[in-house]
């Protein structure tokens, strides 16, 4: 089932998400719905807060990046209760977008390599190191679990310049091809 994506300004995007347990109701269906929503919205990642669920879960399929970044081919994963435990000092700047901030892309500086502990969809524990585009997509989705969106990482002056655009998104004054929930949409 395709779920609506919450837009910038929604309170759930500012909350630190809660850990989940193996008995979380209908978890496998939720994961399937998140992948379906992500594909329908043409995203490469989707975090549970983006579908109005404040839980520590995100899904990734970075395959659309594989022509530019061959290591992204077939990179599809589920991350439950993740924790980034190490980041490199080396950074990488990349223009990011987000399903909760449609029609926007901004340069974001992030560590180029990370180590992350997480549970997969079967609650099997993993500790893995990722770099490049894989690390980038993981960090972007992880931020959603920490109550952050990528514009929180842009320079303060640049964020001020985006104020009107961000307000328009939160009010629903943006064209999108997928279902969204706009927190400040004006009733007419």
Where are the language model's segments positioned?
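Active-site rim/adjacent substrate-binding subdomains
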Residues: 1-139, 144-188
């Amino acid at each position: 089932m395709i779920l609506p994506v919450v837009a910038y300004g929604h309170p759930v995007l500012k909350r630190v998400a809660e850990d989940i347990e193996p008995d979380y109701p209908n978890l496998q269906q939720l994961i399937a719905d998140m992948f379906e929503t992500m594909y329908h919205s043409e995203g490469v990642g989707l975090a549970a807060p983006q579908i109005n669920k404040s839980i520590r879960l995100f899904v990734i399929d970075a395959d659309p990046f594989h022509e530019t970044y061959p290591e992204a081919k077939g990179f599809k994963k589920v991350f439950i209760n993740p924790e980034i435990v190490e980041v490199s000092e080396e950074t990488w700047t990349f223009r990011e977008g987000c399903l909760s901030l449609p029609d926007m892309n901004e340069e974001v500086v992030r560590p180029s390599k990370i180590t992350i502990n997480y549970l997969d969809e079967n609650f099997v524990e993993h500790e893995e190191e990722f770099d490049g585009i894989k690390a980038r997509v993981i960090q972007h989705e992880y931020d959603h679990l920490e109550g952050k969106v990528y514009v929180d990482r842009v320079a303060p002056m640049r964020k001020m310049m985006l104020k009107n655009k961000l307000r328009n998104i939160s009010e629903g004054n943006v064209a999108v091809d997928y279902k969204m929930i706009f927190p400040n949409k004006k009733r007419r």
